[in-house]
Amino acid sequence: GDCRLQTGGMENMGIKRVPTYFNEFACIGGACEDNCCIGWEVDIDDESLEVYKSVGGEFGDKLRRCMNDENSFTLKNNRCPFLNDKNLCDIFINIGEDKLCTVCTEYPRFTETYGSLTEKGLGMSCESAAEFIFKSDKPTGFETEKFDYEEECDEDFLRILLNVRENIFDVLKNRKMNISDRVKTILNYAYDVQDKINNNNVDKVPQSVDNCDFSQSEKCINDIKECVKLCLSLEIMEDSWTGVIENTLGIFDNYDNLSGEFDLYISGREYEYENLLVYFIYRYLLKAVFDCDVLTKVRFAAVSYVIIRQLDIARWLRNGKEFSLKDRIKNCVLYSKEVEHCQDNIDFFDEEFLFNPIFEHNRFLNLI
């Protein structure tokens, strides 16, 4: 469905939107190969904290013993202390699902609220959720329902941003263009949109996207390599990250041949990159209602695409030039855990977009 806000209607009636696959997701619990109760800090929200403080008996004692001063559970051998030997949750078993803290109940679901609009989605860092994001070759769709809302934001600007996002979705889902040209087109469009916002001409934000001819542009391989190298400067969240990036840098010894061969190999599955880009635009673009920075959100989607594509080439090469849906999910989960789950790492890219010459607008187009 169209993701623009409808005008009119009842006072304080808002829209709640989710991707069509959202309600199909269910946690697979102990069967999960990449358990989110292992290696992750579990933050306890205030409401759950009060509940845990009041639980009686032996289990209540254990709850309080395992909490630290930062209101999170202290991991034991890198595992949540309530993850049992069957990889199931003892809090769930002992005091019920409704007593799980918010992060455990919600993850991998995320919720963003923009005044009259609430949007939910599935985060890409969970393997089961990522499978829903990537497995369908049909364009990502969205469902909406009405709800009462209280929070306020600049509704007029939100409407403009929703229109901008819908235009970007239209480009990303236009399968007559190759994926690289789609990314360049949305970067050009976001650049024009940002120019109008910066000059206080929000009412002149372009209502449609200009198509450009990118046939003469040549990829700058050195800049692609520099882009991957930046990943070594991130705060390390995942132990395997550095090794994966160093391995990926090896593809640049024979990049022209390898990337050309991979492009042919993956050409029937470009929809996976389309779904990836729609995910990033859906999750992040409307945050511009708070900071007026559309271009950075689109650049973040674009740089994520560039980096993940290089990770894909490297994994394909390691696998004897095979690359399955499971490989796609592993790369995207790793990237998401490393980048999306660390605000410092998102901020790092935001800074690079401002100051690193490889992200100067026209130069950036040539690394896509």
Model-identified regions with their sequence ranges:
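Hydrophobic, aromatic-lined core segments that form the binding pocket/scaffold
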Residues: K176-I368
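Immediate flanking context of iron-sulfur cluster ligation sites
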Residues: G14-C32, C66-C101, T118
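General N-terminal leader/first-domain-start detector
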Residues: G9-G60
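Membrane helical hairpin/interfacial module
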Residues: W40, I44-N78, L83-K86
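Short, charged/polar micro-motifs that form catalytic or ligand-binding hotspots
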Residues: C27, N94, D154, L158, ...
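Internal, well-ordered alpha/beta segment that forms a basic, Gly-enriched binding/recognition surface
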Residues: N87, I95-R182
